[in-house]
UniProtKB/Swiss-Prot annotation:
This is Leucine-rich repeats and immunoglobulin-like domains protein 3. One of its GO terms (cellular component) is plasma membrane. Residues 1-24 form the signal peptide. The gene is Lrig3. Widely expressed. LRR repeats lie at residues 75-98, 99-120, 122-143, 146-168, 169-189, 193-214, 216-237, 240-261, 264-285, 288-309, 312-333, 336-357, 360-382, 387-408, 411-432.
């Protein structure tokens, strides 16, 4: 019953009571009581004539009173003076009402809070709503010490400035005023008691920070204000708040942490605002939230992690918003949600797993959306809703229902499909819902063909007839008839008015910026207008460029075929996705397969590696990054391969997610070209960067002092390392080196060769190497000792004077017979000419005698590099020297694959020269190589020559000192029963004409004799036996200067050793196979065999050319 009815009943009851009591009167009174007075059974309880009395309530409302009735009964506990014209209160009229606790002065003409006098301290509830109060003054309220409820609604209060006095107030209502500003701390004196605060329908536009320090407040209402933004921590201090209502404020922005501190709040109502997005930022801290009402907003997006802090939510209202899609993360984390209301949105897309996490959901309201495509074409949209009881899908423009549309809804009890013009339902579309109790379906558009025959029987079996109103629209004979009135035989399939897809769109790949088209066709027997649509990733394409065609196609009757072409211009990466065509008419829609479009773009570099020069030991950093679609893979190569020295040593680092390639502790072997390759399915691009490593100069080998005999060749080594390769300069005794015709530099000044050394050459030689990083110096001391005396004058090399140099020749003393106990050393000094002998794979030059090159150029790291011929500048500055070899002799190749290269000094550089494949093209190791030159260093060098045979065979040649031909004898030990044959076969004799014709004229010969000795006759390690005379001679080349012509009589004759007696040589011809092949061409060549005391002499003619004045001479040594 309403308030007016209650008041009427109360008044009627009061009149009856007054009339009855007035007639009865007290016993013996003899008359009536005072008119207008109410008396109870125990005593008289007077009630003013203008009021109504009911229990402890005195109701004087709606009497147009301008002053209080007088007198008021003292028993009044509740006094209602609302809806009068009171403008002031007479305190004297209330002073005797000591029991008064509740006063209602609503809708009067009061302009201030009235003073009720002494009884104010007893008042618990004071209602002053609907007056003209414009201020709340603390002094006006101080007397109400027991006040618990104060209603100041519907007044003219415009500001809340002066703080409330300390009261026991629990309920404060200041609704529908003109409050536009509030002072922080205004309610602080009510902090311990206030439970409910209502500030609805005011003009509040902002809430000041720390406005509400009310730890006991449970309910706060701010509806219908003008709050547009809510800053973070706005409601801090309301730790006990249970509900907050901010409806109809026009809120557009909720900052992060807007509701932080409301950890106990359970209900939040934000309906009728302008929020556009739900994010976890403004929901932060709402850990106990149970209900969230967001209807009538403009929400169009739910961020993936929005519900991270609201996982206890049980009811969510999102009705009347702008949601168009529900993604698989839209409700992630809401496992306790019981009711979800998304009605009256624009939802057209529901992801397959959109509801999968809602395991407790019981009610899902999706009414008045556009999810027809989700129901018609997708399966599993409602999977995961294991406890769903009610599903409302009315008004969603659903036209057909597939068999899998409601997969997973096994517990559904209520399904509402009303308001949809459903045309077809696949067989057993509802069969999996075993607990279904209500199915609401009303449609008049059904296609009553053979595929719908199951529906009437199933509805009847489940007693759903009262909820289903369905009639046929096709065929024409059944149009308008209820499906329950059509016999099963009436559902036939004579045609197919619903479109049937005949041409499916095809999956494609395209380059960014190109044009793409998809084609789709469908056929139908109906002439109903056809509509075409395209979807991308299950969402309708708006404003798509389409071309639509229609034509007749005969196939057992007249059929119409419809074709739609989707054209995509200048495709971008955002164009990627799955495209599907939807062709519809009045009878339903058909959906094509989904064709995938992939957009590719050739990679392009955003960071290109740059050339880098860095010191050894530092860290190299190369950057490389590329973009493309799909994202390109970055790969690195070094010098075209994947062999990284830094990788083997675990000094290389490539971060998969980084753009930087690191090499720590850079070394010389890291030098090279590094290639960065970016590759994807569209192609690949590469960029190169050169890494240069700088290293300070250093000595790769220790500097060794040298001791040579006067007249010998001295070779000083300074093998330099560094990057860039250092420049070398030699000084002698801390002074610039005076370069003479006897000084030669080789291998980039790493070798200093002094020919025909003299005592004046002795001293301290300093090698200074320098590059851009620094300078390094080292000293070598050269000692020159006088020439040792020899037993035979024939062993002494003829002297050379400076005027006789035509070719820089080297005459080396060999076969020195010294005191018993001194070692016998076979030493060969060989300086080869610059003309390359073709049998050693060296190109011959024409007639000009130039110095030969060092066999292999030594790089700064001491490794063998390519040959470099030509002139180089000496470090002294102005003087130029030709790069020459420390060995000047010929190398005699052995064509059966065995051979050895010998040199004329004891330097390691000569040993390295032996490994040059251009000079010694054989296979194997050399064995010991004996170097002549230093009489005090007879030790052999064990050298492996990659191109030489493993059979150590020595080619010994005589040095020609004058223009004659002399006959030399070469001795070899007799190792077996056939020494001559084996020794002669072991000597690598050259092709006689090929070797000699390149240097000497064919009209002169040279005889060589070989002695075959007993095995004990020669010992390389212990020296000669007494009485054994041997010679070690070499056939020398030139350095480009003419030799002085020596005296002919110096070698005119030679003595036969006393122990050389004729011995039989088994009658075998021991000449070289090559010499045999040349015997017919050169009849001057002859072989002479003699055997003397187990020694054989092999004599062969060499045609040699030294100078035009050379005379042939036959000499026996």
């Amino acid at each position: 019953m309403g308030a007016p009815g209650l008041r009427a009943a109360t008044a009627a009851l009061g009149l009856l009571l007054c009339a009855g009591l007035g007639r009865a009167g007290p016993a013996g009174s003899g008359g009536h009581g005072a008119p207008g007075q109410l008396l109870d059974d125990d005593a008289q309880r007077p009630c003013p004539a203008a009021c109504h009395c009911l229990g402890d309530l005195l109701d004087c409302s709606r009497r147009r009173l301008v002053r209080l009735p007088d007198p008021l009964p003292a028993w009044v506990t509740r006094l209602d003076l609302s809806h009068n014209r009171l403008s002031f209160i007479q305190t004297s009229s209330l002073s005797h009402l000591q029991s008064l606790q509740e006063v209602k002065l609503n809708n009067n003409e009061l302009e201030t809070i009235p003073n009720l006098g002494s009884i104010s301290a007893n008042i618990r509830q004071l209602s002053l709503a609907g007056n003209a109060i414009d201020k709340i003054l603390p002094e006006q309220l101080e007397a109400f010490q027991s006040l618990e409820t104060l209603d100041l609604s519907n007044n003219n209060i415009s500001e809340l400035r002066t703080a409330f006095p300390p009261l026991q107030l629990k309920y404060l209502y200041i609704n529908n005023n003109r409050v536009s500003s509030m002072e922080p701390g205004y309610f602080d004196n009510l902090a311990s008691t206030l439970l409910v605060l209502k500030l609805n329908r005011n003009r509040i536009s902002a809430i000041p920070p720390k406005m509400f320090k009310l730890p006991q407040l449970q309910h706060l209402e701010l509806n219908r204000n003008k709050i547009k933004n809510v800053d973070g921590l706005t409601f801090q201090g309301l730790g006990a708040l249970k509900s907050l209502k901010m409806q109809r404020n026009g809120v557009t922005k909720l900052m992060d942490g807007a509701f932080w501190g409301l950890s106990n709040m359970e209900v939040l109502q934000l309906d009728h605002n302008n929020l556009t997005e739900i994010t976890k930022g403004w929901l932060y801290g709402l850990l106990m939230l149970r209900e969230l009402h967001l209807s009538q907003n403009a929400i169009n997006r739910i961020s993936p992690d929005a519900w991270e802090f609201c996982q206890k939510l049980s009811e969510l209202d999102l009705t009347f918003n702008h949601l168009s899609r529900l993604d698989d993360s839209s409700f992630l984390g809401l496992s306790l949600l019981n009711a979800l209301h998304i009605g009256n949105n624009k939802v057209s897309y529901i992801a397959d797993c959109a509801f999968r996490g809602l395991t407790s959901l019981k009610t899902l309201d999706l009414r008045n959306n556009e999810i027809s495509w989700t129901i018609e074409d997708m399966s599993g949209a409602f999977s995961g809703l294991d406890r769903l009881r009610q599903l409302i899908l009315q008004g969603n423009r659903i036209r057909s229902i597939t068999k899998k549309a409601f997969a997973g809804l096994d517990t559904l009890e209520h399904l509402d499909l009303s308001g949809n013009a459903i045309m077809s339902l696949q067989s057993n579309a509802f069969s999996q819902m075993k607990k279904l109790q209500q199915l609401h379906l009303n449609t008049s558009s059904l296609l009553c063909d053979c595929q719908l025959r199951w529906l009437p029987q199933w509805v009847a079996e489940n007693n759903f007839q009262s909820f289903v109103n369905a009639s046929c629209a096709h065929p024409q004979l059944l149009k308008g008839r209820s499906i329950f009135t059509v016999s099963p035989d009436g559902f036939v399939c004579d045609d197919f008015p619903k479109p049937q897809i005949t041409v499916q769109p095809e999956t494609q790949s395209a380059i960014k910026g190109s044009d793409v088209s998809f084609t789709c066709s469908a056929a139908s027997s109906s002439d109903s207008p056809m509509t075409f649509a395209w979807k991308k990733d299950n969402e309708a394409l708006q404003d798509a460029e389409m071309e639509n065609y229609a034509h007749l196609r005969a196939q057992g009757g007249e059929l119409m075929e419809y074709t739609t072409i989707l054209r995509l211009r200048n495709v971008e990466f955002t164009s990627e996705g799955k495209y599907q065509c939807v062709i519809s008419n009045h009878f339903g829609s058909s959906y094509s397969v989904k064709a995938k479009l992939t957009i590719n773009m050739l990679p392009s570099f955003t960071k290109t590696p740059m050339d880098l020069t860095i010191r050894a030991g530092a860290m190299a950093r190369l950057e490389c990054a590329a973009v493309g679609h799909p994202a390109p893979q970055i790969a690195w190569q070094k010098d075209g391969g994947t062999d990284f020295p830094a990788a083997r040593e675990r000094r290389m680092h490539v971060m998969p997610e980084d753009d930087v390639f690191f090499i720590v502790d850079v070394k010389i072997e890291d030098i090279g070209v590094y290639s960065c390759t970016a590759q994807n399915s569209a192609g690949s691009v590469s960029a190169n960067a050169t890494l240069t490593v700088l290293e300070t100069p250093s000595f790769l080998r220790p500097l060794l002092d040298r001791t040579v005999t006067k007249g010998e060749t001295a070779v000083l080594q300074c093998i330099a390392g560094g990057s860039p390769p250092p420049r070398l300069n030699w000084t002698k005794d801390d002074s610039p080196l005076v370069v003479t015709e006897r000084h030669f530099f080789a291998a980039g000044n790493q070798l200093l060769i002094i020919v025909d050394s003299d005592v004046s050459d002795a001293g301290k030689y300093t090698c200074e190497m320098s590059n851009t990083l620094g300078t390094e110096r080292g000293n070598v001391r050269l000692s020159v000792i006088p020439t040792p005396t020899c037993d035979s004058p024939h062993m002494t090399a003829p002297s050379l004077d400076g005027d006789g140099w035509a070719t820089v020749g080297v005459v080396i003393i060999a076969v020195v017979c010294c005191v018993v106990g001194t070692s016998l050393v076979w030493v060969v000094i060989i300086y080869h000419t610059r003309r390359r002998n073709e049998d050693c794979s060296i190109t011959n030059t024409d007639e000009t005698n130039l110095p030969a090159d060092i066999p292999s150029y030594l790089s700064s790291q001491g490794t063998l590099a390519d040959r470099q011929d030509g002139y180089i500048s000496s470090e002294s500055g102005s003087h130029h020297q030709f790069v020459t070899s420390s060995g000047g002799g010929f190398f005699l190749p052995q064509h059966d694959g065995a051979g050895t290269c010998h040199f004329d000094d004891s330097s390691e550089a000569d040993v390295e020269a032996a490994s040059d494949p251009f000079l010694c093209p054989f296979v194997g190791s050399t064995g010991p190589v004996y170097l002549q030159g230093n009489l005090y260093s007879p030790d052999p060098f064990e050298v492996y020559l990659p191109g030489c045979s493993s059979d150590p065979r020595t080619a010994l040649m005589d040095h020609c000192e004058s223009s004659y031909v002399k006959q030399d004898r070469f001795s070899c030990a007799r190792p077996s029963e056939e020494p001559c044959e084996r020794s002669l076969k072991s000597i690598p004799w050259p092709h006689s004409r090929k070797l000699t014709d390149s240097t000497y004229p064919p009209n002169e010969g040279h005889t060589v004799q070989t002695l075959c000795l007993n095995k004990s006759s020669v010992d390389f390690s212990t020296g000669p036996e007494p009485g054994s005379a041997t010679s070690s001679n070499s056939f020398m080349g030139t350095f480009g200067k003419p030799l002085r012509r020596p005296h002919l009589d110096a070698f005119s004759s030679s003595a036969q050793p006393p122990d050389c007696q004729p011995r039989p040589c088994h009658g075998k011809s021991l000449s070289s196979p090559e010499l045999d092949s040349e015997s017919e061409e050169n009849d001057k060549e002859r072989t002479d065999f003699r055997e003397e005391n187990h020694r054989c002499t092999y004599q062969q003619i060499f045609h040699t050319y030294r100078t035009p004045d050379c005379q042939p001479c036959d000499s026996d040594t």
